Amino acid sequence: MQRFAAKRSVQNISVSLWRRCISSTSQAATASVKDSDEFQARLPPFAYTPPPYTGPSADVILSKRKEFLSPSMFCLYRKPLNIVDGKMQYLFDESGRRYLDAFAGIAVVNCGHCHPDVVEPVINQIKRLQHPTVLYLNHAIADFSEALASKLPGDLKVVFFTNSGTEANELALMMAKLYTGCQDIVAVRNGYHGNAAATMGATGQSMWKFNVVQNSVHHALNPDPYRGVFGSDGEKYAKDLQDLIQYGTTGHIAGFICEAIQGVGGIVELAPGYLSAAYDTVKKAGGLFIADEVQSGFARTGNFWGFEAHNVVPDIVTMAKGIGNGFPLGAVVTTPEIAGVLTRRSYFNTFGGNSVSTTAGLAVLNVIEKEKLQENAAMVGSYLKEKLTQLKEKHEIIGDVRGRGLMLGVELVSDRKLKTPATAETLHIMDQMKELGVLIGKGGYFGNVFRITPPLCFTKDDADFLVEAMDYSMSKM
């Protein structure tokens, strides 16, 4: 197999380089798929044809974005896509071309795009009442909070609604500090928790951290079985956490926030045994365990919650993304005792618990149960992971295949022994796969990990097509 000879420094990656890696492909690695007609696989049949698109072209939209929207916004792919329609696990561009969506709006559209059993109740609600404020009674927020609490273990029964994962994590961190009377928060390197003040502090990647005050956050070693200093030894990483608390704090902390699988960080599974050992350490230090389920929640990993695979029960659970299938919705769920801290002052969120969003949330829970999407995520995810692992044996550029359910990562390296990030090659393969009709995400500190987080209605036929497109694209490097 071809071994990619390019060597890149893995000590650091500048923000400007990282942004270029996200939004465009380098000249050296960029090429159109001139021979895509050689690709024999075809998208699985799908009984939906979108109506003709009559809106502005991609060029017009791109021009408006550049003129009127923040320069911090960027697009995937060398030639940005104008997506105008979606149905279940497929997206359609302005020409009507169908794409297999293996990114789901960044792990958001768990039920599938425009799922009729989500759309219909939302339309009915929005026709009747859009936003009454939670200062009045309305059944939508009450019904959803009851259903959501039933999905969580133990005394995790009190729900606070927000509009995003960042908001949810900000609230959780504040509650932990109020409840314990401590200020120190412990997080994990390479984790991502949001882009506001406290969550930016908890995030463990420099490219997401602006030069603003970020107090009292300590970052433990990342328990990454592939790149971590202790490999798969969860106990050694847990000992590092213990030492960090003992020597870097007063010995007492407010809380520990952690993803069950790191999403933005590159679909990194935690080393076996780490989270349960970390839980014990945190409790001994008087802290609360905050489970960040923004990406791994709502059946994506084959468990309903990612933390369930680690045999721990958190004190606070945060969620967003898949909770609303695309509607702006997030939540914090905790115990009645911890929830009581917010009665010390006035706490309010204008749009948190909006009747349309919570109607969507309840519909999502119903669809997941009715269509057995959790079981499908486990079954199809296991099948896809096996296929990707087989692909690793064929292509030297694949350094690691990881994840659970339909939250999978494929890390690309130019040298397996040195684990040199194949960042440019990752972009090139993504672009080729797009030309073949497959959309995937990317992440990881070096931008060299494919993030495969499709809608949970993804089928084995879809998985086969994705793998064939990836195989073909890699073979053309």
UniProtKB/Swiss-Prot annotation:
Obligatory cofactor(s): pyridoxal 5'-phosphate
Binding site for pyridoxal 5'-phosphate: G165, T166, Y192, D292, E293, V294, Q295, T350
EC number: 2.6.1.44
Main location: mitochondrion
Residue positions where N6-(pyridoxal phosphate)lysine is found in the record: K321
TM annotation in the entry: none
Reactions it catalyzes: glyoxylate + L-alanine = glycine + pyruvate
Extent of the transit peptide: 1-22
Gene Ontology molecular function, alphabetical: alanine-glyoxylate transaminase activity; pyridoxal phosphate binding
Keyword terms: Aminotransferase, Mitochondrion, Photorespiration, Pyridoxal phosphate, Transferase, Transit peptide
Catalytic EC class: transferase
GO terms under cellular component: mitochondrion
GO biological process: photorespiration
Subcellular localization: Mitochondrion
Domain of life: Eukaryota
InterPro entries: Aminotrans_3, Aminotrans_3_PPA_site, PyrdxlP-dep_Trfase, PyrdxlP-dep_Trfase_major, PyrdxlP-dep_Trfase_small
UniProt family annotation: Belongs to the class-III pyridoxal-phosphate-dependent aminotransferase family.
Assembly behavior: Homotetramer. Interacts with GRF3.
Protein name as catalogued: Alanine--glyoxylate aminotransferase 2 homolog 2, mitochondrial
Natural source organism: Arabidopsis thaliana
